[in-house]
Amino acid sequence: MFLPFNTRLHHATFLRRPNRFIVEARLDTGEEVVAHLPDPGRLKELLLPEASIWLRHVDNPSRKTQWSVVCSQAPEGDVLVSLDTTLPNQLVTKALQQQEFLPLCQWAYVRQEFTYGGSRWDVLLREGEKQLLLEIKSVTLSEAGVAYFPDAVTARGTKHVKELTAIQQSGDYETAILLLAQREDVTEIRPAYHIDPHFSAALQEAEKCGVRLLGHTSKVTLEGIELGKPVKVDTSERKETSD
């Protein structure tokens, strides 16, 4: 499953990040521009001084910035990493609608943004009389082929995991969490105990209570993003190095 960007990407050099949602960069023409950053995570391993990033131009006079960051180059190689947190939902939803997302291919797509239990869930699926709530998380942090989520403390993410666990235990719906790595150089995904132990413990408990944990990679090019391969999600606590 492939999701095209449908726009030309412009190479730029990362200069600064004044706040979570703004990046200052230098285009190859030498012009310095301000760009919106869709991913509010720390991204400290990607947005390094002089890092290569790619921007798309947004022709919208009402916007504060006329550029948006699309992806960056991983420092350890030629792999591109998507920095647009809206892409995983778009990509996976498109695959689910066509029943081409293999880990859940037996489930039929019903709708996006389904509200239940006080929260809005990314996708609702159905298989016969059973229904499944799916939450999709964007993963960018990776070290030596292992991806970690989250890359910053997420109270909202912890709340969602605990709510899904309660729903699973109630028997009203089946539940699943998909951790989609927005990069291809990943062989395993783990909760980041060294960054957010509360989320990580909640995810481990969710798995014990029957919430399905799915891991998947994606491949990013200058033309678009496509689904990669399923990878293992390991919720066991290990000693990791925190920065």
Swiss-Prot record:
InterPro entries xrefs: SfsA (IPR005224), SfsA_C (IPR040452), SfsA_N (IPR041465)
A Pfam family per the record: SfsA
GO molecular function (one): DNA binding
Family note: Belongs to the SfsA family.
HAMAP family according to UniProt: SfsA (MF_00095)
Family annotation (PANTHER family): SUGAR FERMENTATION STIMULATION PROTEIN A (PTHR30545:SF2)
Protein name, UniProt field: Sugar fermentation stimulation protein homolog
Organism from which the protein derives: Halalkalibacterium halodurans (strain ATCC BAA-125 / DSM 18197 / FERM 7344 / JCM 9153 / C-125)
Gene that encodes the chain: sfsA
